[in-house]
């Protein structure tokens, strides 16, 4: 994808590294660049040894902040399994609203959350 269109690179996978130790703690990405409606969907994962230390919150907010300030983005989306309470707390705490449910072929039932880019910027101005 990047070879054909290098402009998609900022939307793809990034490695999350602890600033103090240099240890890889997880990864984050958007599933694709903004679609024709201006929507981007985040995906993130924190390695098990580093969970519960605030990394997921920082990772998600770093990417949401980037996307919410991009001129082509109007809607931020996050899908999460109902039993993933830590991620649901992060998403709901950021102001996302559950708008749907869908079945993912790999993960099963997922809740679909959305927040407008303008709504994110209003809640987290910087």
Over which residues does each language-model region extend?
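Glycine-centered recognition micro-motifs in short, flexible terminal segments and loops
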Residues: 48-58
């Amino acid at each position: 994808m990047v070879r054909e269109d290098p402009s998609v690179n900022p939307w793809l996978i990034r490695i999350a590294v602890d600033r103090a130790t240099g240890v890889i703690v997880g990864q984050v990405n958007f599933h694709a660049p903004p679609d024709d409606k201006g929507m981007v969907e985040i995906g993130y994962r924190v390695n098990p040894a580093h969970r519960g230390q605030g990394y997921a919150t920082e990772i998600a907010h770093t990417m949401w902040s980037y996307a919410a300030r991009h001129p082509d983005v109007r809607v931020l989306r996050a899908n999460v399994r109902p039993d993933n309470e830590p991620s649901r707390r992060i998403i709901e705490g950021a102001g996302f609203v559950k708008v749907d449910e869908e079945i993912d072929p790999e993960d099963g039932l997922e809740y679909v959350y959305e927040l407008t880019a303008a709504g994110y910027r209003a809640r987290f101005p910087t």
